[in-house]
């Protein structure tokens, strides 16, 4: 099987084109309807949430002896009004977070960097070679789809074992393909290309940067290979990893260029800006656009559950024996346990997300810090490249003016300066003399 000269010329021309990615041009999708399965999950979550709250509300109201029941009897309208305001405030914040989009990357971003007024708009394809490397090909103007499919099939079958990403195979670093492809080297058995890519060799959320990148870049330069110093320090390797990082990636599911801090959600089947997590309680993702609403919901729900616990414990009847006590209070024991257990989770999440906001992180980045491509080189240094200080992080979060164009990785010099600043600032919990956090 051979590629015709037209396709070769298109690949060579596209490799020489300027493919600069500008995060300012990212379009957030607010129109496209969600996937039917996601919409069903959201409706189911809303139904369960409302049903549980309605049942607990009825138990609290009709239970004799509670302070709420006493307020109804005494016609204490002030107490009734503010308690019900807390209840409806929590319900309102839930419907707000469950209906607001997290910040999906619009599929129209497929042609962001192309001139749509010209006939030469490029189309993006992902091909895997025999080493599991995934370059981005911009084939211009129109690819031969049958040959591309055959190439992709050949590439997958040419290697017996292709190491693939176990968690998320959708995000790959956006690299440039080499300028020339030797047409004579393409045959029915193998397809060889000279590319600068990142091999997906681990079970990370997005492919990690391998220390073998230097070998791949210099495999055709025997002098550099022979003169390679095998005793490089860990600091030098980390610096090299930082230099290789890119400020944007490519999603092979959505076929769009995406900025940093963006992840493809398997359940929503969309790329989410500043992906935090997929929450089953709201039936959707938490991301850039609804993280503030999610924090507000956690606060309102915590206050509601705390108030509900305060009211329901006043409805317990005292008895002489444990058996009689259980029999007399059997109706409110399950709701009490439900409220107490429910209170622990949103309050703990509220505290955790408050910490994430002050440090400018997401749950995904916090949990997978050492496995995410663009954060892995910084993990050994203990630096968050997006942290601008607690006060600045909080102001940007509350104003809601955070932009994907602000998510730019630090240079080696900036990392070293931040490290020196942290070393010079004495921290009672973690410093150069001892660490209380391991």
Curated annotation (Swiss-Prot):
It is found in: Membrane. GO terms for biological process: protein targeting to membrane. Glycans are attached at residues 12-13, 119, 144, 157, 231, 360. Residues 190-206, 218-234 have a biased composition (Low complexity). GO terms for molecular function: protein-cysteine S-palmitoyltransferase activity. It catalyses: L-cysteinyl-[protein] + hexadecanoyl-CoA = S-hexadecanoyl-L-cysteinyl-[protein] + CoA. Residues 249-299 form the DHHC domain. GO terms for cellular component: endoplasmic reticulum; Golgi apparatus; membrane. Keywords: Acyltransferase, Glycoprotein, Lipoprotein, Membrane, Palmitate, Transferase, Transmembrane, Transmembrane helix. It is a multi-pass membrane protein. The chain crosses the membrane at residues 48-68, 77-97, 294-314, 330-350. It holds the Pfam family DHHC. Its EC number is 2.3.1.225. Residues 183-239 are annotated as: Disordered. It is an enzyme of class 2 (transferase). PANTHER family: PALMITOYLTRANSFERASE-RELATED, ZINC FINGER DHHC DOMAIN CONTAINING PROTEIN. Belongs to the DHHC palmitoyltransferase family. The DHHC domain is required for palmitoyltransferase activity. This is Putative ZDHHC-type palmitoyltransferase 7. It comes from Dictyostelium discoideum (Social amoeba).
């Amino acid at each position: 099987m051979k590629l015709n000269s037209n396709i070769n010329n298109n690949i060579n021309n596209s490799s020489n084109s300027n493919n600069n990615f500008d995060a300012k041009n990212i379009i957030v999708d607010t129109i496209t309807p969600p996937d039917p399965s996601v919409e069903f999950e959201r409706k189911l979550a809303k139904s369960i949430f409302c049903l549980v709250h309605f049942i607990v509300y009825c138990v609290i109201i009709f239970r004799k002896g509670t302070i709420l029941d006493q307020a109804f009897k005494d016609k204490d309208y002030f107490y009734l009004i503010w308690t019900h305001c807390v209840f409806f405030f929590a319900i309102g914040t839930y419907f707000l977070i469950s209906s607001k989009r997290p910040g999906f990357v619009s599929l129209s971003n497929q042609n962001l960097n192309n001139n749509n007024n010209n006939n030469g708009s490029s189309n993006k394809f992902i091909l895997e070679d025999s080493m599991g490397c995934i370059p981005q090909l911009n084939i211009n103007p129109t690819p031969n789809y049958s040959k591309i499919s055959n190439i992709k099939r050949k590439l997958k079958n040419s290697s017996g074992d292709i190491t693939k990403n176990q968690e998320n195979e959708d995000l790959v670093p956006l690299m440039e393909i080499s300028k020339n492809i030797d047409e004579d080297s393409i045959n029915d058995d193998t397809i060889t290309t000279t590319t600068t890519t990142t091999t997906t060799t681990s079970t990370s959320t997005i492919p990690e940067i391998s220390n073998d990148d230097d070998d791949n870049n210099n495999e055709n330069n025997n002098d550099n290979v022979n003169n390679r110093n095998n005793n490089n320090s860990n600091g030098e390797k980390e610096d090299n990893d930082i230099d290789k990082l890119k400020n944007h990636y490519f999603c092979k599911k959505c076929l769009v260029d995406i900025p940093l801090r963006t992840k493809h959600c398997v359940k929503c089947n969309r790329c989410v800006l500043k992906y935090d997590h997929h929450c089953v309680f709201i039936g959707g993702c938490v991301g850039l656009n609804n993280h503030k609403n999610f924090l507000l919901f956690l606060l309102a729900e915590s206050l509601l559950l705390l108030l509900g616990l305060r009211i329901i414990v006043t409805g317990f009847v005292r008895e002489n024996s444990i058996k009689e006590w259980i029999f007399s209070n059997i109706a409110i024991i399950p709701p009490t346990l439900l409220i107490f257990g429910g209170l622990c989770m949103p309050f703990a999440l509220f505290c955790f997300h408050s910490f994430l906001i002050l440090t400018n992180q997401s749950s995904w980045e916090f949990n997978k810090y050492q496995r995410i491509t663009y954060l892995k080189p910084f993990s050994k240094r203990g630096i968050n490249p997006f942290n601008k200080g607690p006060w600045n992080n909080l102001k940007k979060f509350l104003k809601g003016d955070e932009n994907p164009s602000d998510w730019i990785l630090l240079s080696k010099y900036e990392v070293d300066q931040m490290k020196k600043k942290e070393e010079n600032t004495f921290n009672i919990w973690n410093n150069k003399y001892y660490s209380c956090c391991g």
